């Protein structure tokens, strides 16, 4: 079987950089898990959009009299977390469901859990963190009501992101435990090296079953009517 060509991210042809990953939900993810994995993918997209809105809100915060440090950090968060969140927690959960990989499930739980905690902190909105959360937005109404209204939007979006992350991690954990996943399986994948590029479920089945039967069964050959005894 020929190697699948990478298709994500879908970059324009004039950019001299090729896609880094192959992503196809209907082709690689089991039917019963496709809806959940697609929702986690949309959650990643929503979080990236939240970081973009947060950058605009931090600019309004700065124009309204706030610190420019928040705008600078918001820019760093957008550039850093957009690709890193995809690589560090969406790809692990994608590969986990694609290949039933305990190691990738464990990686997802650990990194996505840290992402959840960070998103909660961003929703709270401590000053100097580069995030327009509830504390920073509400506290800025006395200085610039217009800027504070803009700052409320990322606060709401960060809160929605955190709630969706909590739901996602609970659903994934329930499926993981129900399928018999364990830390011992993750250790086995680590020791054997299969965690780097775990084979799909279809490939695992083919390796296990092998070619037990020929592709086309042999048609029996019978003697002509004159040759029968």
From Swiss-Prot:
The keyword Nuclease does not apply. Residues 208-229 are annotated as: Disordered. It is a multi-pass membrane protein. One of its GO terms (cellular component) is recycling endosome membrane. Probably involved in membrane protein trafficking. GO terms for biological process: protein transport. Residues 1-39, 170-229 are cytoplasmic. This is Secretory carrier-associated membrane protein 4. The gene is SCAMP4. It comes from Pongo abelii. The chain crosses the membrane at residues 40-60, 61-81, 105-125, 149-169.
């Amino acid at each position: 079987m020929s190697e699948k060509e990478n298709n994500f991210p879908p970059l324009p042809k004039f950019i001299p950089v090729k896609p880094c990953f192959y992503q196809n939900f209907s082709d690689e993810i089991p039917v019963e898990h496709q809806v959940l994995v697609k929702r986690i993918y949309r959650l990643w997209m929503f979080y990236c959009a939240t970081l973009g809105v947060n950058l605009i809100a931090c600019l309004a915060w700065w124009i309204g009299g706030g610190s420019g440090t928040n705008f600078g950090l918001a820019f760093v968060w957008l550039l850093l977390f957009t690709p890193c969140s995809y690589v560090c927690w969406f790809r692990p959960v994608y590969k986990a469901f694609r290949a039933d990989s305990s190691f990738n499930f464990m990686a997802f739980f650990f990194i996505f859990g840290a992402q959840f905690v960070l998103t909660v902190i961003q929703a709270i909105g401590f000053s100097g963190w580069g995030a327009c959360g509830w504390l920073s937005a509400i506290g800025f109404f006395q200085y610039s009501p217009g800027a504070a209204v803009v700052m409320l939007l990322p606060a709401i979006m960060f809160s929605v992101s955190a709630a969706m992350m909590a739901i996602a991690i609970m659903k994934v954990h329930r499926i993981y435990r129900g399928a018999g996943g364990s830390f011992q399986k993750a250790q086995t994948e680590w020791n054997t090296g299969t965690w780097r590029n775990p084979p799909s479920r279809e490939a695992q089945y083919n390796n296990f079953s092998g070619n037990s039967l020929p592709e086309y069964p042999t048609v029996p050959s019978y003697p002509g009517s004159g040759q029968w005894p």
